[in-house]
Amino acid sequence: MQRRQFLNTLATVSVVSPLLLSSRLTQAATPPATPSALDPARWSPLNQKRLQAVINEHGVKSASYRPEQRPYAVFDWDNTCIMNDCEEALLVYQINHLQYKLTPDEFAAVVRQDVPNGAFMKDYTTVDGKPVKMEDIASDVEADYRWLHANYKGLAGDKSLEEIQASEQYKDFLAKLYFMYDAICDSYPVEIGYKWILYFYKNMTTAELQAMAEASNNYAIGDALRKVKYESSRTLPGKAGVVADTHFHGIRIHEEIRGLMHTLRANGIDVYVSTASIDDVVRVFAGNPHYGYGVPPENVIGLRMAMEDGKYTTRYQPDWHFNYGPGKTVGIKNVLVKQKGYGPMLVAGDSDGDAWMLRDFNDTAVGVIVNRMKKGEIGADSQQAAAQLGKPDARFVLQGRDEHTGLMIPDEKSLKYGKDELKLLA
């Protein structure tokens, strides 16, 4: 998955009853019938051949298949099963609709929770190059929220959402709150930022969060893929000053991944998702039949927040691992290997958050890397995939996509947004 996504959503939130959402997620556990062969679709021909060989070797057609020990596959979600990040889309959908259940004092505590004071890393400055301190920008965002809370009719005021969105306070709030998210994720250990985004769900029920997530998904799927720069208010510079950030809008379903999931199940291979987003948000996208992936809610492993009286708190669930990087391997071991006695047959991912689970299990026949030409830990896995290109027993494969369309392409190389040349590696 990729952090640092920013979705400017202005659609009206749809209301989904808990009963209806539960019904939809239950239906998702039974996918439609699919052929046992993997549709070539837009897969790289080499990848389709390798995946089909792995399915044949481990699925129901194999002489060694044992139904009491069903093989399984594990997929990262954001930027693997879809293009872009559904939880980050939700962050801005929540901002745009001011869908908070926080008093101003609660918001003031949440926006500062677990984040050190002091200047962010040098990449995060004001538009005129001055350092931005956490305590200053938090103060500005708190002041914005207090005004928004007092004035928006969906909270404690009487102004419409359209009136609110035309205000300087809203403009400042949107740009600065997302700038904070980016800056926190890049300036401090990633665990701080990944959990911080979840604290804004405080006082929501699971049904309320999932209804908001579905509305956000639907808007993002219909939104254009485009990069837009957002700047905070120049008339309300506050303590931090004027900041700006750029976001890549839109989400797209990766039809080849969705098809692979159905083909795996048709061949007696179970499908799981491991995500560094909160599990309840990804369960909507992975399980709602409107999106077609067919992953039941219990098969999603992600971040978890402690609940109190049926509502989210700002406490991470005690004794639950942080499901990112090495933590994804921990989650697979604690949840799946502990139950089954063996590791995943196939793992798919796109970033450093997935690099360890892609390579940590001896039982894994193939690791599918959605190629984003990244360095770091996933870059090391990608280098191995490039070295094994075309080998019939390749342990890693690179799958290309075009970021202008959000579609996979029949190549190992990818096309970055704004570029016109396919590339294999960073």
Model-derived segments and their meaning:
Residues V54-I55:
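N-terminal regions that are enriched for targeting/export leaders
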